[in-house]
Amino acid sequence: MNKNNIIGFLLIAVVLIGFSWYNQPSAEEQRTAFVQDSIAKAKHAEMEKASKAAAAKRQTDAKAKVEADSTALFYSALKGQAKKIVLKNEKVELTLNTKGATVEKAVIKGYVGHNLQVKDGSAEAKDVTLFEGNDQSLKFMLEAKEANIITSDLYFTPSNVTDKSVTMTAVAGEGKTLTLTYTLGDDYMLHMSLQANGMAGLFSPNYNKMDVDWSDKARQQERGFMFENRYTTLTYHNAEGGTDHLNEGSEKIDEKIEETIDWVSFKNQFFSAIIVSKDNFEKDAFMTSIPQEKGSGYLKQFQAKMKTAFDPTGKKASEFEFYFGPNDFQILKNTEKESTFGKDLEFQKLVYLGWPVIRWINRFFTLYVFDWLSNVFPMGIVLILITLLLKLITYPMVKKSYMSSAKMRVLKPKLEAATAQYNKPEDQMQKQQAMMAEYAKYGVSPLSGCLPMLIQMPVWVAMFNFVPNAIQLRGEKFLWMSDLSTFDPIFEWNTNIWLIGDHLSLTCILFCVANLLYSWMTMRQQRDQMVGQQAEQMKMMQWMMYLMPLMFFFMFNDYSAGLNFYYFISLFFSAAIMWTLRKTTDDEKLLAILEKRYQENKNNPKKASGLMARMQALQEMQRQQQAEMMRKQAELNEKKNNLGK
């Protein structure tokens, strides 16, 4: 760069700096500009605030417009005085409120209610009140062009009132009405139809469904909160068949049902409220269950939000049916005859009878025997008779099992002599084979003792599922038990103790004592027939068996007195049968019979039974595999020793 270029750049820089300095505002101008900028910012903030206020005003005006439209649409129905209409028959008494045109109280006759919502105990026992007042809410929501119509906000005018029917009408304007008609049958079913008249112009042309919002605060009806709460569920029925329920726990549950359903039930342990839609409820119904605190008098808060068909033209009514009644299997099954929808509603599935195999036992045996006996005897006697009947049915197999154990007991000296040479751990396979061979000589099957237990276990599980759901036991007294459907406390206290709760159940204690006695008898019987190390192992296992009654105590202290009483008498009879068989069995005669059989088999050997032959073949295969493994291990050890040398 030459000298002229440098001078030129310097002059340009001087000009730029001078021009910038010349155009720089003075201090006064800067202050003025700052003030103006502050004013501009304030104006901008004010404009934003005004814009927000205007938007809020527009929303308020829009809301006011909707309210004004709604008032104009149902001016006469939005104001009024609520009246009570009572529908009743010999089974139920339903109180309807003209505000909302819904059932606000349901009383089930013939079942004693405890009214646990009254905490001071001043209320006397009377018929069961399923819900009352704000416990229950049902509203239908219709989306009109300019406003939503919510039935719970409207006052309806009753007409054609009888003991079993009523028509309720809300007037929307000239020639425009919304009518709900209720008809009570002779049982627990209430039919309801909702129909619009002259309102087609209020809705969009394609509008054909409405929202149904049903909620209920399930009352505690029984004494045991934890036990009743376990059987209190929100249950729904698939339109294609089959029921399901929310998996309620200790937290709030929200669930979307991705299938079409035709009814929803808010189910207590022994009573249910059900809503059925003739045209079904559409997919994506939203169900909620919220647990309630113990001592509040309530169990769970249920809510079901659904959609179903609605005809704005009024040519077709939206029809519903309600069931307010007991969870009695036969009553629920026969209720379908009261329905006018012609559906297989399967209400009886609300009574849980167990898994498929267990349900089959309860459905086709326990239910029929229970109903038959309960028509003649008190419920406590029915439980005893059912136990005796089951013991009578299983007695031949129990006796066969005991005789098999007795044969093994009298053969114990011979087994010890035959297996005396197999004392090493690696000789256990040979020892088992020697024992099986000795049993085969005398025609004894060591597996025959398992059959009775395999048969009795499904019966025990069946009763475990049946008794807690048997409403026939509710309120029934027997001996010291005031109610067979709940626990029978011998002691109670106010503080909740972990694992025990706030009481001690007498029938649970009796059940556990009987279980301890029966375990001691069976363990001694099994120990008497064991040989060598098996007997020592049995001594160690018996302590585990003795812990079972203690575990059962913590598990069943909250369970019903009826179930614990059944288990108590079942174990008592089992112990009595075992004691009788032991006293009537002569070991010397039994051994003589076995010796005679041995001589007969020795002179005319018989082929082993299929099961015994398979066991012997399996043991022989295991012996060969063990021998092969030992041979390979010996070869490997020999190679290691040779390498070491």
Where are these regions (language model features)?
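Short, Gly/Pro- and small/polar-rich lid/capping loops
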Residues: 49-82
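Soluble non-transmembrane domains of integral membrane proteins
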Residues: 77-345
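Helix-loop-helix
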Residues: 1-54, 96, 193-197, 206, ...
